[in-house]
Amino acid sequence: MATTLSSSSLFIQFRGRRYNSLSSFNNLQKRTVLSLSCALSSQGGDMIPPEGKSNDRNSAFDFKSYMIRKAESVSAALNVSVPLQEPLTIQEAVRYSLLAGGKRVRPLLCIAACELVGGDEATAMSAACAVEMIHTSSLIHDDLPCMDDADLRRGKPTNHKEFGEDMAVLAGDALLALAFEHMTFVSNGLVAPERMIRAVMELAKAIGTKGLVAGQVTDLCSQGLNPDDVGLERLEFIHLHKTAALLEAAAVLGAIMGGGTEEEIEKLRKYARCIGLLFQVVDDILDVTESTKELGKTAGKDVMAGKLTYPRLIGLERSREVAEKLRREAAEQLLGFDSDKAAPLVALASYIACRHN
């Protein structure tokens, strides 16, 4: 019997048993993501199956397989979206970063949100690709000498190291434009025009001066500041805009494309905001606890640059506590949705909390 969630009475019916509290629901979540495990390998973020894994396929969601399938689908769609054509140099620069792998968390989130509200992968794919194009654009620009001056990204030389600063700037610009072109062209006929207009507005807002750009500017202006003079409010502003805004857009776009109601869209917005902050808190922790080899990028760079980070402001232990609190808050936003369809998003929050790179 499928799990039944009631947001009004807050009980959960699962195989004839009733759970009447959020803590009971959290226990159910642990079984739902049993196959996830917090043990991650140091290469590519692959999950190591935990000992004693349940053989009951109905009680455990295989997030690893789900993530691999979605990442492969997204990568195939991205490959088609940027064919090699003249001028070859810019196309090669675009493809170099866009097809460099990665966990594809943002497009996965977009697709899972679409499926949660009744849509399917095909309907969400153009938006999922658009979000990944913008994410890649932001990474190319973020790595430039005038920004973070990074040498490695996903275990490879950064775009400007491979193609030069001029071509890297243009590759990032091209991806930004291509994202909107791709989403609107490919989705034509699949999504109602009014929903497409809203999706475009949401995505544009997420990456402009009310979103990603605002976070990057505040981050740059905060380098070298004394942590004692800067509160958590400023750090949260940076991460809500620089990191969470695009994750939020991914979830909202998926819900819009899938025909979600206003209530469903807002629940997914709050969920994504929580995992967006969670993603960055964990990123800050990994920057001081993992090696360059494990991360696929230069470890300790934020500390060396004097950046504001959660460990720098509140220490490692409190940072871990904040991460767990955000994971729980994200899961709470999924109460009321069909549990089978929500399983990928429950697992995604746990994956982000437990990742090693």
Curated annotation (Swiss-Prot):
Annotated Mg(2+) 1 binding sites: 142, 148
Q: Which UniProt keywords apply?
A: Carotenoid biosynthesis, Chloroplast, Isoprene biosynthesis, Magnesium, Metal-binding, Plastid, Transferase, Transit peptide
Assigned EC number? 2.5.1.-, 2.5.1.1, 2.5.1.29, 2.5.1.10
- For the ligand (isopentenyl diphosphate), the binding residues are 103, 106, 135, 154
Annotated binding of dimethylallyl diphosphate, by residue: 153, 242-243, 280, 297, 307
The record's GO CC annotations read:
chloroplast; plastoglobule
- Cell compartments where the protein resides: Plastid, Chloroplast
The family this protein is said to belong to: Belongs to the FPP/GGPP synthase family.
Tell me the subunit arrangement. Monomer.
Return the protein name: Geranylgeranyl pyrophosphate synthase 11, chloroplastic
